[in-house]
Amino acid sequence: MLAKRIIPCLDVRDGQVVKGVQFRNHEIIGDIVPLAKRYAEEGADELVFYDITASSDGRVVDKSWVSRVAEVIDIPFCVAGGIKSAEDAARILEFGADKVSINSPALANPQLITDLADKFGVQCIVVGIDSYYDKETGKYQVYQFTGDEERTKATQWETRDWVQEVQKRGAGEIVLNMMNQDGVRNGYDIEQLNMVREVCKVPLIASGGAGAMEHFAEAYQKANVDGALAASVFHKQVINIGELKQYLKQQGIEVRL
């Protein structure tokens, strides 16, 4: 069995790490490089960096920090933000990232997923999906441009359908960002994860809602996700990654120690 991954997520804006609640009201957490280093030393399996305003600003990730991160950590890391072409992706991978993640640009141009998978291999291509549960319709809807409160909007895709579509096009991994749970720390949306897991044949990463160690265990045991991504519990030192891994091991969950 493959070890379950613990993945701190660093939202980046203007060269600093920030964190919001339900994709709004972001506060500054600190500088990128020291945080990345701290998480790698604590035992993170991987890091994900989202340049949260790149897509809505119509630019690509600010690459200056990508190479600085690559110099100080020895675990894989993934970078997302405004990657609209193979050239954009190539530059980020050249700067030292192991994977690129695309979200809004994939919705605007689904062919991009295939182009990137063909050029760099599916193992490098992650598709991020921002999924919002609409209580009125009872449906999970995919949103885009979620890094900018003014521009964020629903797409025509329902989450489950988009999960199937991106796999057909060559996504090697899916990060499901559950918007209703984001930053609230009440636990992952297990029901939604199970719905997606049924149709997701590639590695699935849960994102949004981690508030306690048992929330990670639940996502692994009840929804069989491959990795769990979290931000505020790590940034605010509510949970230490080393201690989390010991706890998961005691629960009988395979992790890399």
From Swiss-Prot:
Organism of this sequence: Vibrio vulnificus (strain CMCP6)
MF-aspect GO terms: imidazoleglycerol-phosphate synthase activity; lyase activity
Location of the active site: D11, D130
Subcellular localization(s) per the UniProt record: Cytoplasm
Catalytic activity: 5-[(5-phospho-1-deoxy-D-ribulos-1-ylimino)methylamino]-1-(5-phospho-beta-D-ribosyl)imidazole-4-carboxamide + L-glutamine = D-erythro-1-(imidazol-4-yl)glycerol 3-phosphate + 5-amino-1-(5-phospho-beta-D-ribosyl)imidazole-4-carboxamide + L-glutamate + H(+)
InterPro entries (UniProt xref): Aldolase_TIM, His_biosynth, HisF, IGPS_HisA/HisF, RibuloseP-bd_barrel
Record family assignment: Belongs to the HisA/HisF family.
Pathway assigned to this chain's UniProt record: Amino-acid biosynthesis; L-histidine biosynthesis; L-histidine from 5-phospho-alpha-D-ribose 1-diphosphate: step 5/9
UniProt name for this protein: Imidazole glycerol phosphate synthase subunit HisF
Key words, A-Z: Amino-acid biosynthesis, Cytoplasm, Histidine biosynthesis, Lyase
Any GO CC annotation of this UniProt entry: cytoplasm
HAMAP family referenced in this protein's UniProt entry, alphabetically: HisF (MF_01013)
Oligomeric and partner information: Heterodimer of HisH and HisF.
Biological process, per Gene Ontology: L-histidine biosynthetic process
UniProt-listed Enzyme Commission number(s): 4.3.2.10
Main function: IGPS catalyzes the conversion of PRFAR and glutamine to IGP, AICAR and glutamate. The HisF subunit catalyzes the cyclization activity that produces IGP and AICAR from PRFAR using the ammonia provided by the HisH subunit.
S-S bridge residues: none
